[in-house]
Amino acid sequence: MPIITLPDGSKRAFEDAVTVMQVASDIGAGLAKATIAGRVNGQLKEASDLITEDAELQLITLKDEDGLHIMRHSCAHLLGHALKQLYPAAKMAIGPVVENGFYYDIDMEEKITPEDLKQIEKRMKELAKTKYEVIKEMTPRAEALATFKERQEDYKVELIEDMPDETEFGLYHHQEYIDMCRGPHVPNMGFIKAFKLTHVAGAYWRGNSDNKMLQRIYGVAFADKQELKDYLRMMEEAEKRDHRKLGKSLDLFHVDELAPGMAFWHPKGSTLYRVVENYMRQQLVENDYQEIRTPLIMDRTLWEKSGHWDKFKDNMFTTETENRDYAVKPMNCPGHIQVYNHNLSSYRDLPIRLAEFGLVHRNEPSGTLHGLMRVRSFTQDDAHIFCTPEQIKEEVQACIDLVFNTYADFGFDNIQVKFSTRPEQRVGEDDVWDLAEEALEQTLKDANLEYALQPGEGAFYGPKIEFQLKDCIGRVWQCGTIQLDFSMTQEERLNAVYIGADNEKHHPVMIHRAILGSLERFVGILVEHYEGKFPTWLAPTQLVIASIADVHNEYVNDFAKKLKKHGFRVESDLRNEKVGFKIREHTLQRVPYILVVGDQEMENGTVNVRARGGENLGSFSFEELIDHLSEDVSRLGRIVES
């Protein structure tokens, strides 16, 4: 007689074992119709799964993140179903969930075209409208192998053979189509109402370039058609803001196959990058950080001690010389501990805040590289704070304040916070993880911050707080992190110590923190957020002074020199072109201010000022212009309430 406890604390007793769906039906027909699955004692279960003993149950609908995830996964199966009907010879590989949607990797002779995508999507919609039931069968290993061998699904066979310890597999029956998955999935295809296939890309089987190149069909899926419509509208806007296109048209940077995943910064892009870096450098000064620099390449033994070699070696670039193995650093923390360890610190010296604009390299798969957003070489605005356990809360709170102030200065005021706990693959003892997680979560609560819990998503060495900013078209970007680390400073790792008040050696707590994350990625976010129309303080070129005729050139150059002495980034346009042409060209380059000099301006010692939006601000003397620009720049990117 299982007793089911619901999230509101209410209990329901049943005579016999009961399915998740039967519990939903017992509560109400409306809830049963909306129920996709359930969390039974924290574990996701099918709506058809039996509950045989007392349990806590959360019913999952499309209003829940879990529900969206399940629906999107089922949409991948629906894609597989449609593909096999249209292309019976296609071989199905894997079809997981990704952000906002799903994909399926397939091996087939035909090259899928945009027109083919429309036909595949049409077939998916036809199948979904039938609301056919999805049936799961736990199938013995031998039978599962036989099923996929008979269907000539070579990739499914390989997956089964690579899991020798599994005795049975979940096979999902979609009418005549069978797929393999851990699940759960929707009870019937009526839950899939709003989706769209977006594009096709190439992908190596299992991400290994030695394997066959497959076709990967991507799609997005949402709970209802309005959400899908809003998302597609956002994507249209994002296409116009693509930092790769703007990077080219604004002459900021380029990427090249000569160096996959690594940016070539042009003068204007380098200026923008430097402005961002120098802003962060000033924050270091104001918040009592000490800036350091550590080697790019360090001995393998350091990475073995730190735990990176065991957990991260597949993503590390390595080299060898004089019979010694080295790794190009993927992270800065081990190097920072070497700097900390160079001197023996007292508890009176703590906290010690070490910061670095550290260039790191990670061997990301070529298929995942994307402009500045996903790269192999990037600079982290990285810092590590060595402190006592008693100082954790104050230091974490200071980091949180720095995050929010920094994002506000760059024009972001919608920040989401997530708290990630211990992953399965980790270093350190559970009692140490308990301390670390409790310390971070308590600081969040004391700061009255709303946050989402992400179980199992922490770093291998400690739990973390993640900060995600929402841009002007509603996209969410994960940037800042604060991570608590009780492990890497321990004797069996990198053995950082300080002398405590008891005159004994103790291991400090290490707080990893990054505000922007990757500078390259953050610049890419800024380009898309502002569509290249940067606030004046960020703009690579803040002003252009255009002469109307050659006779005005000397005056223009002198005016520009004076502006440069006041720290402004200014260019002179002395070309023998019509002034209207010059204005249009610099407007397309998103320059905040265009100054025009003709006979009247030269005679009066002024310039005519046009703002980026096209507004003619009139004539300004040099002093008036300096006052106006200084006020503009002082606002940084902060959003001014009207």
Curated annotation (Swiss-Prot):
Gene3D superfamilies: 3.10.20.30, 3.30.54.20, Anticodon-binding domain, Bira Bifunctional Protein, Domain 2, Threonyl-trna Synthetase, Chain A, domain 2. One of its GO terms (cellular component) is cytosol. Zn(2+) binds at residues 333, 384, 512. It catalyses: tRNA(Thr) + L-threonine + ATP = L-threonyl-tRNA(Thr) + AMP + diphosphate + H(+). Residues 242-535 are annotated as: Catalytic. Keywords: Aminoacyl-tRNA synthetase, ATP-binding, Cytoplasm, Ligase, Metal-binding, Nucleotide-binding, Protein biosynthesis, RNA-binding, tRNA-binding, Zinc. It is an enzyme of class 6 (ligase). SMART domains: tRNA_SAD. GO terms for molecular function: ATP binding; metal ion binding; threonine-tRNA ligase activity; tRNA binding. Its cofactor is Zn(2+). GO terms for biological process: threonyl-tRNA aminoacylation. It comes from the Bacteria. Its EC number is 6.1.1.3. Residues 1-61 form the TGS domain. InterPro entries: aa-tRNA-synt_IIb, aa-tRNA-synth_II, aa-tRNA-synth_II/BPL/LPL, Anticodon-bd, Anticodon-bd_dom_sf, Beta-grasp_dom_sf, TGS, TGS-like. Its main location: cytoplasm. Binds 1 zinc ion per subunit. It is found in: Cytoplasm. Pfam families: HGTP_anticodon (PF03129), TGS (PF02824), tRNA-synt_2b (PF00587), tRNA_SAD (PF07973). Belongs to the class-II aminoacyl-tRNA synthetase family. Catalyzes the attachment of threonine to tRNA(Thr) in a two-step reaction: L-threonine is first activated by ATP to form Thr-AMP and then transferred to the acceptor end of tRNA(Thr). Also edits incorrectly charged L-seryl-tRNA(Thr). This is Threonine--tRNA ligase. It comes from Hydrogenovibrio crunogenus (strain DSM 25203 / XCL-2). The lineage of its organism: Bacteria, Pseudomonadati, Pseudomonadota, Gammaproteobacteria, Thiotrichales.
